[in-house]
């Protein structure tokens, strides 16, 4: 009968890591399985947030193809199953060849942990295959490589099998194959080596994730149809494509074009490294003080050591939650770098938004876009701060602690720190992911509760009309109770997280302290070493206590950053062609030739529109709402590109010249004038930002608003308010006309510039517009036909087509649509609504 003995059996409770010309089997089979188990669980944790894609209705199951990559995936799956079974087979081999010798406890632990770690890898392999198949079923290529966690697990497993080779000359291992037991273990090791090596190589290839491995059948009768190449809208893990996100983020870490800030970044990195050194030196000097006090050292040595310790403590930080001189200096220096980064991101986003088309802006809520900009900017600076100055330093402290305790204490101390901190991080991530849904539900219910209160107060009179105060109070009470129930879950889960963290640190401190006390009692360590270990572990616990918060913030920032980068990836619809030159303006002849155009819905807004505006002429566009009149102006200004046909100015295709040169020759007076929340002078100056005050006043006089401006208490420095709401409709239109006069364009576009004004204001504005349009090519969109009776040509547009054209008298004599519209307006029947 086989029995289990002590953990390390002959090596004692804590033998050395290197003994008899090789690694200690006890140490090796404690470290490696623990590491693999940690990596396996961590890989699973990072996959937990990934949700399964919903396969669209009508999409059938994917079938295996007879392609060359199906067999490699089957081999990969077989190797993963074999790898999971081999540790148990090794344990069975040990039991079968023990011959009455007690098995050390570490073998049992190693077999269980290695099998569980391999099971994690197998499960991840199947899940990633399933995700790839679902992605393919939706016509979206999700990825063509395994996750970082799975690759790391296979890499470390293969590296561990190679690490065994350093013990080739050690009699503790099976290399001599002296008996049946060693021969069995050697054979199993060869099998493990081949298995782990095969998984490592196949993992880099990832045959099970290649699209050629599948055949997609959708609705059988449409098998030859193209795949949907649209972007998937499924919720994705925050940590997916982490490497790509970090590469994008790293571009903002280095302030390009600013040598002084680059030097500041290097200095901050140096200070961060100094902080890591201080975290080691402070416990060391604390240990030295205890040892000096214990050994009754001379006062001079003690005073020098205490002084040095206090100085290092000043540099590091005085107590819990406080920051020291080095950290404060680094924070101070980083302010300029953070401002540089924030400024660069905001300017890049702002420039990109102005490059996007009018179609894009009309389809988006401005508030939503600005939230993406604000959150995206803060996410970049926040991520840099959290990652560079919180997460990375904490992980560095853990690694330094593992190395230090392994080298200067005993390898078992390094293993204890590694297991304790790994378990701490894994449990923190798992519990944080688990409790995220409680926080999300609580926020949703909080919004609903506030909405309930706001809705009730906004309808105050209605509540009074129906004596519904009690009903509203009860509804609000129910909403509060529901919110508080979710709040309790969120708070209780936070308490559970904190208690879990406390237990892990407590067990780690207990294990390390007992081992340290054992070595002190054996005279292998000093009393100060016991103090050093406890101080360093407690010191690590302080930043780790905030790890859950950092994790949540990084999650949120990654999401905001993704939205920002999605915004930056929006394609510019209207672009200058390569090699486009400036518009060479001569006289101002405008031509539309067989122009077709449609918006996103596919319905043609303009159909075969052709007309010519001779230099200095005025052409009016009239017709019912939605006919396409304003669209013609937008196409000429090149807010959109036409579907077919050609638009020319002085014989030059406007799609072949630069947009900025085209728009510099065109002035627009829109129907709904929107002014900036600035002074009247600056709103007029917007027509030409280099204009002086005298030019602004001259433009205002030409627009007939100079006297009205002077009547204001602050004159030209009067603030117009948001969107110009402090001015009347007529005053806003005159400011817009003055702005256009100041621009002095060669072509004028008037988009129902007076339709929203009363009769007296309209006549005054028409007089101002007549001055602006003199000797300039002008296109007018008109609602009131009386304003265009003197136009050189009137185009009647209906359903995107020009159905009549001519001068006012000729169109009336023809008795067509224009004559009917004129008759109705003369009778005072406003049957033609304003154009949209």
UniProtKB/Swiss-Prot annotation:
Intrachain disulfide bonds: 8-26
Described function: ATP-dependent transporter that catalyzes the transport of a broad-spectrum of porphyrins from the cytoplasm to the extracellular space through the plasma membrane or into the vesicle lumen. May also function as an ATP-dependent importer of porphyrins from the cytoplasm into the mitochondria, in turn may participate in the de novo heme biosynthesis regulation and in the coordination of heme and iron homeostasis during phenylhydrazine stress. May play a key role in the early steps of melanogenesis producing PMEL amyloid fibrils.
Record-given protein name: ATP-binding cassette sub-family B member 6
GO molecular function: ABC-type heme transporter activity; ABC-type transporter activity; ATP binding; ATP hydrolysis activity; efflux transmembrane transporter activity; heme binding; tetrapyrrole binding
InterPro entries given in the database record: AAA+_ATPase, ABC1_TM_dom, ABC1_TM_sf, ABC_transporter-like_ATP-bd, ABC_transporter-like_CS, ABCB6_N, P-loop_NTPase, Type_1_exporter
Keywords: ATP-binding, Cell membrane, Disulfide bond, Endoplasmic reticulum, Endosome, Golgi apparatus, Lysosome, Membrane, Mitochondrion, Mitochondrion outer membrane, Nucleotide-binding, Secreted, Translocase, Transmembrane, Transmembrane helix, Transport
UniProt subunit comment: Homodimer.
Required for ATPase activity, as annotated region: 1-236
EC number: 7.6.2.5
Principal location listed in the UniProt entry: membrane
Positions on the Cytoplasmic side per record topology: 48-72, 128-147, 207-264, 327-375, 419-499, 551-836
Residues spanning the membrane: 27-47, 73-93, 107-127, 148-168, 186-206, 265-285, 306-326, 376-396, 398-418, 500-520, 530-550
Segments on the Lumenal side according to the record's topology features: 1-26, 94-106, 169-185, 286-305, 397, 521-529
Membrane-related topology note: Multi-pass membrane protein
Sequence ranges assigned to domain ABC transporter in this UniProt record: 590-824
Subcellular location: Cell membrane; Mitochondrion outer membrane; Endoplasmic reticulum membrane; Golgi apparatus membrane
Originating organism: Rattus norvegicus (Rat)
UniProt comment concerning the protein's domains: Contains two independently folding units, the N-terminal transmembrane domain (residues 1-205) and the ABC-core domain (206-842) are respectively responsible for the lysosomal targeting and the ATPase activity.
Binding site for ATP: 599, 623-634
């Amino acid at each position: 009968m086989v029995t289990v003995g002590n953990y390390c059996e002959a090596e004692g409770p804590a033998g050395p890591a290197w003994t008899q010309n090789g690694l200690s089997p006890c140490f090796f089979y404690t470290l490696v399985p623990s590491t693999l188990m940690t990596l396996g669980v961590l890989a699973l944790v990072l996959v937990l947030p990934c949700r399964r894609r919903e396969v669209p209705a009508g999409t059938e199951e994917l079938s295996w193809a007879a392609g060359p990559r199906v067999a490699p995936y089957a081999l990969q799956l077989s190797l993963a199953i074999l790898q999971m079974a081999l540790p148990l087979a090794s344990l069975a081999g040990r039991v079968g060849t023990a011959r009455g010798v007690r098995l050390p406890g570490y073998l049992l632990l190693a077999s269980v942990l290695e099998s569980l770690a391999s099971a994690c890898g197998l499960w991840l392999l199947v899940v990633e295959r399933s995700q790839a198949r679902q992605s393919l079923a939706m016509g979206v290529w999700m990825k063509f490589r395994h996750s970082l966690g799975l690759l790391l697990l296979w890499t470390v497993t293969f590296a561990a099998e190679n690490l065994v080779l350093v013990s080739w000359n050690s009699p503790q291992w099976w290399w001599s194959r002296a008996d049946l037991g060693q021969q069995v273990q050697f054979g199993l090791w060869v099998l493990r080596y081949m298995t782990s090596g095969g998984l490592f190589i196949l993992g880099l290839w990832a045959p099970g994730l290649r699209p050629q491995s599948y055949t997609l059948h959708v609705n059988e009768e449409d098998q030859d149809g193209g795949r949907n190449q649209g972007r998937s809208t499924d919720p994705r893990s925050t940590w997916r494509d982490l490497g790509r996100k970090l590469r994008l983020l790293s571009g903002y870490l280095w302030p390009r074009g600013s040598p002084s800030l680059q030097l500041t970044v290097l200095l901050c990195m140096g200070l961060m490294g100094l902080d890591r050194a201080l975290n080691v030196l402070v416990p060391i000097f604390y240990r030295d003080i205890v040892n000096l006090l214990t050994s009754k050292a001379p006062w001079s040595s003690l005073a020098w050591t205490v002084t040095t310790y206090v100085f290092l403590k000043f540099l590091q930080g005085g107590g819990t939650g406080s920051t020291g001189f080095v950290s404060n200096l680094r924070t101070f220096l980083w302010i300029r770098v953070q401002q540089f980064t924030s400024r660069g991101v905001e300017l890049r986003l702002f420039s990109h938004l102005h490059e996007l088309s009018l179609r894009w802006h009309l389809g988006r809520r401005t508030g939503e876009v600005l939230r993406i900009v604000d959150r995206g900017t803060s996410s970049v600076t926040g991520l840099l701060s959290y990652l560079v100055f919180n997460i990375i330093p904490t992980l560095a402290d853990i690694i330094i602690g593992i190395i230090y305790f392994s080298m200067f204490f005993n390898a078992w101390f390094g293993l204890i720190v590694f297991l304790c901190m790994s378990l701490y991080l894994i449990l923190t991530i798992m519990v944080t992911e688990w409790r995220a849904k409680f926080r999300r539900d609580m926020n949703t219910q909080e919004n609903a509760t506030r909405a309930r209160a706001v809705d009730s107060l906004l309808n105050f009179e209605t509540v009074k009309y129906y004596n519904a105060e009690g009903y509203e109070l009860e509804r609000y009470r129910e909403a509060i109770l529901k919110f508080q129930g979710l709040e309790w879950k969120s708070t209780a889960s936070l308490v559970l997280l904190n208690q879990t963290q406390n237990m892990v640190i407590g067990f780690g401190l207990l294990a390390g302290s007992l081992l340290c006390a054992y070595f002190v009692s054996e005279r292998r360590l000093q009393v100060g070493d016991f103090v050093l270990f406890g101080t360093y572990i407690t010191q690590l616990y302080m930043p780790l206590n905030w790890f859950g918060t950092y994790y949540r913030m990084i999650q949120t920032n990654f999401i905001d950053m993704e939205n920002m980068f999605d915004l930056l990836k929006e394609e510019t619809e209207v672009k200058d062609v390569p090699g486009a030159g400036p518009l060479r303006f001569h006289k101002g002849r405008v031509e539309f030739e067989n122009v077709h155009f449609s918006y996103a819905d596919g319905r043609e807004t303009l159909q075969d529109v052709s007309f010519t505006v001779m230099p200095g002429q005025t052409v009016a566009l009239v017709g019912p709402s939605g006919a396409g009149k304003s669209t013609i102006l937008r196409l000429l200004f090149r807010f959109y590109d036409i579907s077919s046909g050609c638009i020319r100015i002085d014989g030059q295709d406007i799609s072949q010249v630069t947009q900025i040169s085209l728009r510099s020759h065109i002035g627009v007076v829109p129907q709904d004038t929107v002014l900036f929340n600035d002074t009247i002078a600056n709103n007029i100056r917007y027509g030409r930002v280099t204009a002086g005050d005298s030019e602004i006043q001259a433009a205002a006089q030409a627009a007939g608003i100079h006297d009205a401006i002077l009547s204001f208490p602050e004159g030209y420095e009067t603030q117009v308010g948001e969107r110009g709401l402090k001015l009347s409709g007529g005053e806003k239109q005159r400011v817009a006309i003055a702005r256009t006069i100041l621009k002095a364009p060669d072509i004028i576009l008037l988009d129902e510039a007076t339709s929203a004004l009363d009769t007296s204001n309209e006549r005054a504005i028409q007089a101002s517009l007549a001055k602006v349009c003199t000797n300039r090519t002008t296109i007018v969109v008109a609602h009131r036909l009386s304003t265009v009776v003197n136009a050189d040509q009137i185009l009647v547009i209906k359903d995107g087509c020009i159905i009549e054209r001519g001068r006012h008298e000729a169109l009336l004599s023809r008795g067509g649509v224009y004559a009917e519209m004129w008759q109705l307006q003369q009778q005072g029947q406003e049957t033609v609504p304003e154009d949209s």
